[in-house]
Amino acid sequence: LDLHRDLLASDLWLFGDGPIDPRGLPRVSLGACGIATFRLTTYGPATSLHSGHYGNVAPNPAARLAHLIASMRADDGRITINGFSADPPSQRSRALAREGFDTEGMLSGPAIAETEAGLSYGESIMRPALNVTQLTYGGAGPQRNAIDSQASAGFDIRLTPGITPQRARELIEAHVRNQGYTLVDAPPTLEQRRSIS
């Protein structure tokens, strides 16, 4: 690519990506959501502990992570992180979004009763989205009576104009701090676990 950069220069990119219209109509959509991904891990005791001996004593990473996720996203899909709202689309853009997609067809195939916010499919994808894509706690197999040492969640954010990946990161980090968490870029040391609640 670097060797032939001049041959690859262009004024426009066309991507063959996106959902197929259930009516079979060809579609050209102008604009696309960007994406940023991140992972949050909450920590508790240094090792797994018996919940009968340490329930209500040791911080429960899974419960804390669940509260943190709930603080970031409303039931209707809106991101509730301060500063994360995008400029609302114009009436014309909203009308085009409603008319440009077969909402009923887009929802019936994957068996979705309604969009999270009750908007049309097109209006829904015009909004920034925070998706929980992975949750990890405990291990595979039968349920255990244990409080484990950490819980983790993977996320993707569908970005809309005006929200860059860097800005999204800044807003998320500020939100996590405002919820009372200390951010670390590696698993906490024993000393950190003993001093940070």
Please report, for each region that a protein language model flagged, where it lies by residue.
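Metal-dependent amide/peptide-bond hydrolase catalytic core
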Residues: 37-197
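Flexible glycine-/small-residue-enriched beta->alpha junction loops
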Residues: 27-41
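Acidic/histidine-rich catalytic neighborhood of metal-dependent amide-processing enzymes
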Residues: 1-31
